[in-house]
Amino acid sequence: NNLAFDYQPDIFHFNFCGHSGSFIIDNDGNPTVINGDFVEIDLSNLVNDEQTQNEKENYPHPKSSAKIIITTLDGYQYIFGGNLSAIEYSGGIRAATKIKDGGGMCTSRFVAANAWYLTQIIAPDKRTVNFSYKNTGYTDYNDNIWRFTEHYVGPPTALPKHSLYKNITPTSFTGYTLSKECILESITIDSPYNLRIDFRSSVAQHKLYSVSRCGMCKPNYQLDAVVVTKNNRPFRQANLRYAYQYREEDNDNSYYWRFLSRVTLSDIGSYQLEYGHGSME
């Protein structure tokens, strides 16, 4: 009697290069624009197959070939996704100790894609702009899901294929959610411009959340430099440096704040930034 089905369609929002709007997928699997610019949307490569149990237990992820193609009235084609580095996704897990020792996630839930990032622009004359993203794996962690799992009373006898309740035990348990974000790595513009913009990033010196949770968390990243090359020759570069401030709180909930401390431009010089927030590291 507690089984319920959600028939409300998911709303997909898009916003790129001056075009914005929303669309839904109807019961026949076709996209329908519900507001915003008129565009043609191709979902033929948007794969949503259920994962195998092995995929669920070993750092699961969406199908890597999933992509959305949007064509605007001026004939430009915009491609989103198409590889895992350009898909933002998240999933729930159990048995948190498995994260610490690098083992599988032991999850009984499928992972959901939250966003598809722009990977390519194709002009009517076939000129292209390509966007690539860093292969980061999971970059965020949240331990509040237990508040929801307390309400699970056991799986019903009949389950829809993609049910979130599949194989969950009748008793409550502590669970975790992990999120994989997309971090832009480079933009390449072909002839006649022959430009490449590299966004160089590294693992931050300190993690920017509760110190007591750091053992469970993946590293976060910081932007170190933006490098522009033209015809394979250096053209312009900006380097960034950061400072950290330790914030001590009660209940072992201390954390760091990060501040931009210096910007160096190859064609201008350096800028120093100072803050009135106490000592920095």
Give each language-model segment a name.
Residues 63, 73, 111-114, 124, ...:
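Active-site-proximal structural scaffolding
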Residues 70, 80, 121, 187, ...:
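Beta-strand-dense domains in secreted/periplasmic systems and polymorphic toxin scaffolds
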Residues 79-84, 107-112, 129-139, 171-178, ...:
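Aromatic-rich beta-strand edge motifs centered on tyrosine
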Residues 149-177:
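Surface-exposed acidic, glycine/proline-enriched linker/cap segments
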Residues 185-187, 203, 210-236:
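Long, polar low-complexity repeats
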